[in-house]
Amino acid sequence: MKKAELVFIPAPGAGHLVSALQFGKRLLQRDDRISITVLAIKSAAPSSLGSYTEALVASESRLQLIDVPQAELPPLEFAKSPAKFFILNIENHVPNVREALTNYVSSKQDSVSIVGVVLDFFCVSMIHVVNEFNLPSYLFMTSNAGYLSFEFHFPAQDSRTGRPPKDSDPDWLVPGIVPPVPTKVLPVSLTDGSYYNYLGVASRFREAKGIIANTCVELETHAFNSFAEDQTTPPVYPVGPVLDLNDGQARSNLNQAQRDKIISWLDDQPEESVVFLCFGSMGSFTEAQVKEIALGLEQSGQRFLWSLRLTPPKGSKSLTPVDCSNLEEVLPDGFLERTREKGLICGWAPQVDVLSHKATGGFVSHCGWNSILESLWHGVPIVTWPMYAEQQLNAFRLVKEMGLGLEMRLDYKRGGDEVVKADEIGKAVASVMENSEVRKKVKEIGVVCRKAVEDGGSSSVSLGRFIEDVLRNHFGSE
């Protein structure tokens, strides 16, 4: 049999690229017939992923990365609707991706056969480009099966209403999600001006030859049962958790001295005594909210490690959060002195290293799917503080459907006027450290997630099925 080549086209963004590369790495380790070429679209936001991707490519002889030339960015006023800006930026890159794919295909030797293209789910607008090469398109979901079910359901819901949802609308009945979904926890993109761009993405999901999901069947059984009952759904391959357990992304953003300081501090804390607050690469707060978080932590009486990043100053063209240069300016008077025996505040944090540390006992999170999987993997219960994208839906399901998290907020949205008060924060932090029932359940599901990716586990079997289907779909027709 010829060598088989898969082309990956991740969406531009740290979480999307890292997940795609980690999935690619797992494919290469599983089957030596396969090689992978990644067509990488540059992120519109500043990133320090270069050293991470270079190291990963250098460690895998059958993995190569080709940079797609930067296209013109959408007008900056669209950045007020992040999903709209993100989707338009991807669509602007379609001609450049077509050219890169053309050049790559024409350069291939006869001994290597391109068997398919794995597109990030946000890159569905490129399916027609892949079709031009008579190649099958597979979608890679960096999120979960419940969210995939929502994407399948969204066009049907729109056909009934024809407009963005309102808070007063009835709950949505999504086939792959057990409880009815309140409109206030639907993805932010449905109400921030991105609705029709988002609808355009969701309406093309069924055109894919198959969909790879970063989850496992045991975590989302109901969603996978709903896919099996729907004859119009493409095959869905749960292959997760797909995680960067070496925290290579974080280390590319963090010097060794900073990391050592954090880990050394954790080493001095009792087991499961520290609550970790971290809100992802784009999570940030105003100074007013920072003060309330500080007071809430103090009221809780718990030890804490807080990754503190601020909203960019007004008038800034950047959407990227900034580290705080002077903590005393933004924290309540005397806070640092009063909590110096109990807390540590940092900028960027090595999240996986922290979650895997024996001292960590709770996680206040923005509920990005990668962060949820990392926390479950390491058996750390979560307090929900969603901010953007589909995080409100993730938080809702984590608390109401899975019973694996504790609610602080399910519908908080970044950029709003709401300030969560110290009392609410303090109670939530204390509850996650004291709730033994949720902690036990999270530790149990962590074991399940680990077994899923071991030889013979559900995700390992599903990965093998994906490989065989891809190869059979291509070589079986020759």
Curated annotation (Swiss-Prot):
Its EC number is 2.4.1.-, 2.4.1.358. Pfam families: UDPGT. Disruption phenotype: Loss of fruit pigmentation, and substantial decrease of the levels of various acylphloroglucinol glucosides and an anthocyanin. It catalyses: a 2-acylphloroglucinol + UDP-alpha-D-glucose = a 2-acylphloroglucinol 1-O-beta-D-glucoside + UDP; quercetin + UDP-alpha-D-glucose = quercetin 3-O-beta-D-glucoside + UDP + H(+); pelargonidin + UDP-alpha-D-glucose = pelargonidin 3-O-beta-D-glucoside + UDP. UDP-alpha-D-glucose binds at residues 142, 349, 351, 366, 369-371, 374, 390-391. It comes from the Eukaryota. Coiled coil: none annotated. The active site is at residues 16, 120. One of its GO terms (biological process) is fruit ripening. GO terms for molecular function: UDP-glucosyltransferase activity. An anthocyanidin binds at residues 16, 389. PANTHER family: GLYCOSYLTRANSFERASE. Belongs to the UDP-glycosyltransferase family. This is UDP-glycosyltransferase 71K3. The gene is UGT71K3.
